[in-house]
Amino acid sequence: MRPLPLGVEVGTWRFPGWQTPPLHTPAPSASSSPQPRPPTMGEPAEPRNQAKWDPYEKNISAISQNLSGEYFRYKGILFPVGIYSPESISLVENAEVQDDDIFIVTYPKSGTNWMIEILSLILKDGDPSWIHSVPIWKRSPWCEAIMGAFSLPNQPSPRLMSSHLPIQLFAKAFFNSKAKVIYMGRNPRDVAVSLYHYSKIARQLKDPGTPDQFLENFLKGEVQFGSWFDHIKGWIRMKGKENFLFITYEEMHQDLHSSVQRICQFLGRPLGEEALESVVAHSSFKAMKANTMSNFSLLPHSLLDQRHGAFLRKGVCGDWKNHFTLAQSEAFDRVYREQMRGLPTFPWDVDPEDASPDSDPGPDPSPNPDRAPEAPHP
């Protein structure tokens, strides 16, 4: 892809009151106890030994001190070193899938934890005890993360799991199973802004650089988990399958009650009105931000430094308009139209407030948006 014209207003998004934190916590001294190292590309896969991987969960704080902020490539996709490994991703690709498994799949910063909270409540019929007693990352482990990949066999049924994997790296067994995937999409402009903020406090991620630099990398897919465009275009091919639900952050933000009903229907777990209202109330942004089991405040600063910005920032739609410059908006729109042409429209395409200064109306809707193209796997 040719370089993007992002230099008209160089190096600034408008982030009121933002102060850039130090890039990374200093490395531990030589006297620190050595920590287990994930295998690197080219090393033979080691036997699945749960005892070997227990230290990752028991010593999160110590391990987080060794995060380098560097990435490795696995089949062309970037992953942060230390949180993921080639072996953990390979485990997911070849993992067994149970018919009652429930997967939440998203591109990063698309509302994953919101969906985890909702499903945690639905699976408990609206009872908030689980979300108030168990950390969110244990309720729905990340499949491809080192800790998640090796803990999946021990998860009780029905297993609730989360993933940012593009479709080509997802568990192959899923495509011949009755397991369910809920894919949550979000306006990529808001995703980019949220990911920029997150990259400032998440120690496993590279420093994002200037907003111009980060946006250029985002549009080229040179960020963790690769291209947003490739991610959503890959998974949207599942639309129309009985075990696949596509829903957007914007739909849920506009009408959470109806969205929860739709999710319950997809899961075959109808709720009474009282339980439904409990799900809606306890999964609100305000409730999640106040819940220590859901706001990631239990993580050490060396892993997620919320002294420089909250993990749960705003929970709104359209925040990109407070940050994008005119040049950035125009550059984004050009790439978006090129990448998304021919796909069905999304809620963010038809929002008049999201219209950019560019005169092109955006991607053309497909003749039949509800028709699912060919399956991604034989």
Task: Name every feature range the model reports, one short phrase each.
Residues 277-288, 325, 329:
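C-terminal anion-handling pockets and recognition modules
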Residues 189, 228, 234, 240, ...:
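Conserved C-terminal subdomain of P-loop nucleotide-binding cores
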Residues 113-125, 247-271, 279, 287, ...:
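PAPS/PAP-binding and catalytic site of the sulfotransferase fold
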Residues 2-4, 11-15, 19, 23-247, ...:
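PAPS-dependent sulfotransferase catalytic domain
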